[in-house]
Amino acid sequence: SYFGEAIPPNEESFQVHEAAAMIEQFGSATGLFEAEIVQSCKTIGCWMTVKGPHVDTVRVFMKDHAFFVPKDSIQGKKTYFYGEAFYDTLSVNLQKHLLEDAGATLMEIDAVNVPAHQLIFEAAGVMIADVPEGAPMASDK
């Protein structure tokens, strides 16, 4: 299933962990990346976290909140997302908000007390393999 802008055809995909090296070498990393989905925003589907070999979980935001991914039924699925990778500092308030979106416990949310410098992806388009028909979307609320 596709979400957001169309992914350019014949685009070579990169593993998530390759983004850091691309940023270091070229100053930025724009392209098609692939990874396995760990979780998605339970509120509206405006972000997902993905994993890749030899790298911590990284967050993928949907560019300008222009589209959303399913809130459930996508964990463990392979995804391709087209967009930009960059490093950014997430404020304490934003981290807490994201934890709330993920359904974290109050103890987990309260434990956040310092900004976090992280690798972030901003996706213009997303493809998720094998999304079941009727997967809950934000519009299903």
Task: Name each region found by the language model.
Residues S1-K141:
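OB-fold and OB-like single-stranded nucleic-acid-recognition modules
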